[in-house]
From Swiss-Prot:
The modification Leucine amide is found at L81. SUPFAM superfamilies: omega toxin-like. This is Mu-theraphotoxin-Hhn2o. Residues 22-48 form a propeptide. Keywords: Amidation, Disulfide bond, Ion channel impairing toxin, Knottin, Neurotoxin, Presynaptic neurotoxin, Secreted, Signal, Toxin, Voltage-gated sodium channel impairing toxin. One of its GO terms (cellular component) is extracellular region. Disulfide bonds join C50-C65, C57-C70, C64-C77. Its main location: secreted. InterPro entries: Huwentoxin-1 (IPR011696), Huwentoxin_CS1 (IPR013140).
Amino acid sequence: MKASMFLALAGLVLLFVVGYASESEEKEFPIELLSKIFAVDVFKGEERGCKGFGDSCTPGKNECCPNHACSNKHKWCKAYLGK
């Protein structure tokens, strides 16, 4: 009887330790995933080689991405509609 109680108690302690270890790993996973998704280096405009919508530009230098044009009035890239 004492052996079975000891074995049951040891099993519960082992289950608690394994559950705690897996829970701590699960808590770190979303943080790592979000830090990789929202990393600042990934979304830099300089890596594209062209400027997107709303980026400042100099008219006549063709700095904007395709389907965008530099506005003479506002000096930022706007969607080019063909006119």
